C-alpha cells in the first residue's frame, strides 16, 4: 500500500513537471530570434530541430526528477541513480546550449562568432558533449557486470558515492580542458598554430572521444560472451525479435500491464542499443572531423550534423525509462489515470458542462 502511494505521488510530480516543462519548451521554440530565416532550408531544419530538442529536454527532465526522487527517498542502489541523474542533467544542458546556438545564428553567420556569449556557449556545448560520452561509459561498465564472481572488476558493481563523485569531478575537469583546447583551435586561425599543431590537436581530440567508445565496445563484448557461455547463441538479437521489441515499446502504454522481461532479453536489448548509440556518435564525429580538417562550412552539412548530434540525447532517456520497471509502471499509471482517451474525454465533458452553467 505504501509503495502504491509513493508511485502515485511520483506520478503527480511527473505530471506537474511535464506541464511546466512543455510550457517552457514552447516558449523556447516560438520566441527564438528570426536571424536564421535567411539560411537556405532553415524551415525544414526548424521542423526537425525544435520538436526534437523539446522532446529530449522533456524526457530527460522526467528521468532526472525520478532518479533524484529515488536517490533521496528510496533504498535502491544509489550509484546507478547518481549516474543516470548526472547523464540526464548533461543531456538537458546539451540540448539547451544547442538551442541557444541555433537561436543566435551561430552556424550561419560569421559575425556572431566574435561575440563572447557565443564563445561561452560553444565551450559549454563542447563540455556537455564530452560528458555525454564519458558518463554512459561508466554506466555501461556497471551494467555489464552480470556475474560478479567471474568478472575481475566485481568490486565496481556497487561503487560508493565518493567514487562516483570522484569520477564526475575527473570527467568535468578533463572535458573542460578539452573544451579549452577545442575553442582555441576554433577561434585562432591555423597560421598561428601551424600545420603540425593542428594535426596533433585533431589526433588528441580523436583519442579523447575514442577511448570511452572503445570501453563501451569491450564491455558489450564481455556481456555478449558471458551470455553466450551461459545461455547459448543469442538468436533473439537478430531479425524479427528486435522489430517485436520496438513494436512492444511503442504499444506498451496501450496495455494495462506488461509481461516481465528476462535478464537475457534485457541484456541483449542493451547491447543493440548501446552499439547503435556508438554508431550515432561515430557519424557525428566523422562530420566534425571532416569539417575541422577541410575547413568547409556547408550549411546543410552543419544542420545535418546538429540533428544527428542531438539524437542520442533524445533517444537515450526513452531507453532508460523503458529499462526501469518502476519508472515504466509510474508512467503507465499516469497514462491510465490522466492521459488515456476516456479520461481526457471525461475531463473535456466536465469542462464543457461547467462553461454551460
Curated annotation (Swiss-Prot):
Keywords: Cell membrane, G-protein coupled receptor, Glycoprotein, Membrane, Pheromone response, Receptor, Transducer, Transmembrane, Transmembrane helix. It is found in: Cell membrane. Residues 25-52, 103-130, 185-269, 322-357 are cytoplasmic. Residues 1-3, 74-81, 152-163, 291-300 are extracellular. The chain crosses the membrane at residues 4-24, 53-73, 82-102, 131-151, 164-184, 270-290, 301-321. SUPFAM superfamilies: Family A G protein-coupled receptor-like (SSF81321). One of its GO terms (molecular function) is pheromone receptor activity. It is a multi-pass membrane protein. InterPro entries: Vmron_rcpt_1. GO terms for cellular component: plasma membrane. The keyword DNA damage does not apply. Belongs to the G-protein coupled receptor 1 family. Putative pheromone receptor. This is Vomeronasal type-1 receptor 5. It comes from Gorilla gorilla gorilla (Western lowland gorilla). The lineage of its organism: Eukaryota, Metazoa, Chordata, Craniata, Vertebrata.
Amino acid at each position: 500500500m505504501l509503495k502504491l502511494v509513493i508511485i502515485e505521488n511520483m506520478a503527480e510530480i511527473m505530471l506537474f513537471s511535464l506541464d511546466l516543462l512543455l510550457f517552457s519548451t514552447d516558449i523556447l521554440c516560438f520566441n527564438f530570434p528570426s536571424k536564421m530565416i535567411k539560411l537556405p532550408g532553415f524551415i525544414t531544419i526548424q521542423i526537425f530541430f525544435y520538436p526534437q530538442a523539446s522532446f529530449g529536454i522533456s524526457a530527460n527532465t522526467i528521468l532526472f526528477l525520478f532518479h533524484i526522487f529515488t536517490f533521496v527517498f528510496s533504498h535502491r542502489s544509489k550509484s546507478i541513480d547518481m549516474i543516470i541523474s548526472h547523464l540526464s542533467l548533461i543531456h538537458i544542458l546539451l540540448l539547451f546550449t544547442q538551442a541557444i546556438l541555433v537561436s543566435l545564428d551561430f552556424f550561419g553567420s560569421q559575425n556572431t562568432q566574435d561575440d563572447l556569449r557565443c564563445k561561452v556557449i560553444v565551450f559549454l556545448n563542447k563540455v556537455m558533449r564530452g560528458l555525454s560520452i564519458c558518463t554512459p561509459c561508466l554506466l555501461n561498465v556497471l551494467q555489464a557486470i552480470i556475474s560478479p564472481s567471474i568478472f575481475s572488476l566485481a568490486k565496481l558493481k556497487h561503487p560508493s558515492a565518493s567514487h562516483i563523485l570522484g569520477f564526475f569531478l575527473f570527467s568535468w575537469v578533463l572535458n573542460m580542458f578539452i573544451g579549452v583546447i577545442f575553442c582555441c583551435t576554433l577561434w585562432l586561425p591555423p597560421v598561428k598554430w601551424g600545420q603540425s599543431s593542428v594535426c596533433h590537436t585533431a589526433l588528441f581530440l580523436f583519442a579523447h572521444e575514442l577511448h570511452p567508445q572503445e570501453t563501451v565496445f569491450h564491455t558489450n563484448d564481455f556481456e555478449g560472451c558471458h551470455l553466450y557461455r551461459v545461455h547459448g547463441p543469442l538468436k533473439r538479437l537478430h531479425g524479427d525479435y528486435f522489430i517485436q521489441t520496438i513494436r512492444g515499446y511503442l504499444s506498451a502504454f496501450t496495455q494495462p500491464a506488461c509481461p516481465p522481461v528476462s535478464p537475457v532479453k534485457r541484456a541483449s536489448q542493451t547491447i543493440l542499443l548501446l552499439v547503435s548509440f556508438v554508431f550515432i556518435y561515430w557519424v557525428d564525429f566523422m562530420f566534425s572531423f571532416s569539417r575541422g580538417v577541410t575547413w568547409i562550412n556547408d550549411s546543410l552539412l552543419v544542420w545535418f550534423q546538429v540533428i544527428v548530434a542531438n539524437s542520442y540525447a533524445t533517444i537515450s532517456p526513452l531507453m532508460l525509462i523503458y529499462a526501469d520497471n518502476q519508472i515504466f509502471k509510474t508512467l503507465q499509471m499516469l497514462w491510465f489515470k490522466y492521459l488515456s482517451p476516456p479520461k481526457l474525454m471525461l475531463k473535456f465533458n466536465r469542462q464543457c458542462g461547467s462553461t454551460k452553467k
